[in-house]
C-alpha cells in the first residue's frame, strides 16, 4: 500500500466491523468510476474473519466494472471453495506453505481482464511474466498439496465443523468464558 501511495496512487483503507469484516456500506461509498483496483483478504490471517468476497465482487462489478478485484486467498485456499469467475475475482493469490506444500512457491490466478506486467524482465519464462528457471519441484509439490486439500473436501469440512462445535460446547461449560 505504501508503495502505491509513493507512486502517486490514492489509497482508501476501509473500516471493519466488530468481527473484523470489511463494512460493505463503506466499500460502496468508496467505489468511484476511477477506481482501478480493490484488494481484500478472503480470510484474515490473524483474526480468522471471513470477508464476503462474492458480495464485494458483485458490488465492484456493478459500481465500477473497469476495476480489478484482487483476493488474497492464502488463508482460504484448501479450506473454502473459491469461484473466481462467478465471484468477479480478477486476481487471486495463493501460497503453497499454507496448504502443507513447499515453502517459496505459490500461484497467482489472473483473469483475462487483468493485464499485468512482469516484475522481473528477462528470459520470457512463464509466458513472459517472470524471468528465471521454473521451480519444478516446488510447482509439483504445490500441485500435489492442492489436490490433497480438495480430496474429500466436504468430509473434511464437516469434520472440522464437528470439532469446532465440540470445542465451543466444552468452553461454554467453563465459568467466565464467553464465546
Segments predicted by a language model, with ranges:
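Pyridoxal 5′-phosphate
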Residues: 1-179
